[in-house]
Amino acid sequence: MDNIVYDFAKITFQAKDNRSPTTNSNLSWQLNQMALSDMEEMQDTSEPIAPPESDDNVSSESHDSDDVDSQLSRCEDNDDDSDCISGSSRRSSTFGARAGVARRRMPARVSKDNFNRICSAIMKPIKKKQRKELNTNAQTLKSIEKIYTSRRMKKFTPTNLETIFEEPSDENAADAEDDSEECSISSQVKVVKVWGRKLRRAISFSDGLNKNKILSKRRRQKVKKTFGKRFALKKISMTEFHDRLNKSFDSAMLEGDDAEAGGSAEAVNIPKTSMTMEDIQLPTMSSQHQFLMQPAGFE
């Protein structure tokens, strides 16, 4: 413990010299130049004018020259030390900043003012304006009609076009209804096979811009007529319902008697009586149940 305290007592804290190494080298170079100029002036002033040379003068001149050489050598030593210190500090600073990576500074490139250079950027195509009006010509209509009526065009996918092949026939065209509004441009009535059934189909070509409410209503009515058939219910009175039941029973019993007589010729003849609804007593209905919902096709 005493040794540690003794070692701490030896430590002396001194402020570091933050001056740059370049300033120190410049100051030392200026001091050397000043010392050399002072020595030259002193030599010029101390020289006598044409005295006779003697041993004392030679000895004094040699002594002065020795002094100057010693001073110059000291200055050179000081310069070398300062250069070494500045170089070591510079290396340490660069090593700490770049972490041991040595990089070479390249000179800046000269800018080339070439205004006729072609731009290398990829130019975007100009957006096409959407057409608000549909251009309908006779040629375009014929091409559309050819696509729908030709059987040779097989390159179209089912999502783009219908997969029904249609064949024109004059007989179906004569029996078709004439709808001038729906078939304003061109129409053809075809016989189409769909799920094993032959259906009549009219194809119309229009520009797609002119839409009429009457035309849409007619199309909806046609769709309901073909695909939306239902049994229509009709109200009838109870007496009419009883009469229809009696007729149906009588016809059924007579058909049964004829079948038995023709089928068994050797059978024993048994007296048969025809039974009617008058013999059957139906319960009396109240006034609230006078009418009943019955299908119109029941006869």
From Swiss-Prot:
Bias (Low complexity): 84-93
Region (Disordered): 16-100
Annotated Acidic residues bias: 53-69
Major site of localization recorded for this protein: nucleus
Database matches in InterPro entries: Tantalus-like
Job of this protein: Potential cofactor involved in sensory organ development. Despite its interaction with the Polycomb group protein Asx, it does not regulate the expression of homeotic genes.
Name of the molecule in the record: Protein tantalus
Name of the gene: tant
